[in-house]
């Protein structure tokens, strides 16, 4: 419940003792310069740290990172709204995960530059992750970045990329030449925008590396499960019948996508006013 305006780092959590800490209901705005400027930076030990980062409204002005998390295990990033604009740095990131194990990234709303033809989005990414074993990136909405979701290196384990909506982007989903996210079977990601290059890109040059991140989709359930344009050396998306994941049915985001307004808790006086129990009957 803080309003934070900063020129370098809005909130820094640096090698804190592992706990179940929370960063919730904050408004954070960083107008800094340089490659290290971030709104929220969490540098963890490589052990379970269990941070819950939820319902924050984050604005990245002349900075690089909305949320930056290095190392740590089992951190959750939920229902955050992140605005990244403008891009004065060469690159900018909504959420950046570096070696974070078992991260949960759900129900976030990420919006970048709105002048793609002029800026080419620079090298911005809505969500970037590498070395994020057993990740769960589900039901996020990304728009107006160069890369909607960008993946680097190997992300082993049971990775889940589900129910994400790729809006207007230069490239929707981007995997580097050695990137691995595991098989994604009927996970219901939606390509619902204009893509100035490709909706989905895999830079791998061998079929074996591409198949370690292959997608099964059922376009009969929803035509938007099938990216409108794909760049890959081998078949990456296969259309076959199956039961598709949807965010609504799974009730992943009961508060909707992004930052939400909280109901004010009633105190005892509020409850008395509502009930009409103020004792006025004892006075003329």
Predicted regions and their residues:
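Extracellular beta-strand/beta-solenoid scaffold signature
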Residues: 5-16, 30-48, 60-70, 81-100, ...
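Extracellular/surface-exposed low-complexity segments
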Residues: 208-284
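Extracellular distal adhesion/interaction modules in secreted or cell-surface proteins
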Residues: 6-14, 18, 36-39, 48-50, ...
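A detector of tandem-repeat and repeat-rich interaction/domain scaffolds
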Residues: 139, 158-163, 184
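Polybasic, proline/glycine-rich intrinsically disordered low-complexity segments
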Residues: 175-230
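Repeated loop/turn-to-beta-strand initiation elements of outer-membrane beta-barrel proteins
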Residues: 19, 75-76, 103-104, 134-136
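Short, intrinsically disordered, charge-balanced linker/junction segments flanking boundaries
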Residues: 1-4, 42, 52, 126, ...
């Amino acid at each position: 419940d803080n309003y934070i305006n900063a020129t370098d780092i809005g909130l820094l959590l640096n090698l804190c003792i592992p706990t179940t800490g929370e960063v919730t209901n904050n408004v954070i705005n960083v107008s800094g310069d340089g490659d290290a400027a971030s709104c929220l930076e969490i540098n963890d030990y490589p052990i379970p740290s269990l941070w819950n980062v939820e319902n924050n409204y984050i604005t990245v002005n002349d900075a690089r990172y909305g949320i930056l998390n290095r190392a740590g295990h089992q951190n959750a990033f939920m229902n955050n709204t992140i605005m990244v604009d403008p891009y004065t740095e060469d690159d900018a990131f909504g959420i950046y995960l570096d070696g974070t194990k078992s991260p949960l990234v759900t129900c976030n709303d990420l919006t970048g530059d709105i002048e793609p033809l002029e800026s080419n989005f620079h090298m911005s990414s809505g969500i970037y992750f590498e070395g994020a074993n057993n990740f769960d990136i589900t039901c996020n909405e990304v728009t107006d970045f160069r890369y909607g979701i960008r993946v680097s290196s190997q992300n082993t384990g049971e990775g889940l990329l589900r129910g994400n909506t790729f809006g207007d982007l230069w490239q929707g989903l981007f995997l580097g030449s050695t990137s691995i996210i595991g098989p994604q079977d009927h996970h219901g990601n939606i390509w619902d925008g204009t893509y100035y290059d490709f909706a989905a890109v895999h830079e791998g040059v061998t079929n074996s590396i591409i198949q370690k991140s292959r997608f099964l989709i059922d376009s009969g359930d929803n035509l938007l499960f099938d990216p409108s344009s794909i760049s890959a050396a081998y078949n990456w998306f296969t259309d076959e019948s199956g039961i598709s994941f949807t965010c609504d049915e799974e009730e992943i985001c009961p508060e909707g996508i992004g930052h939400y307004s909280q109901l004010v808790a009633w105190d005892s006086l509020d409850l008395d006013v509502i009930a009409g129990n103020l004792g006025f009957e004892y006075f003329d």
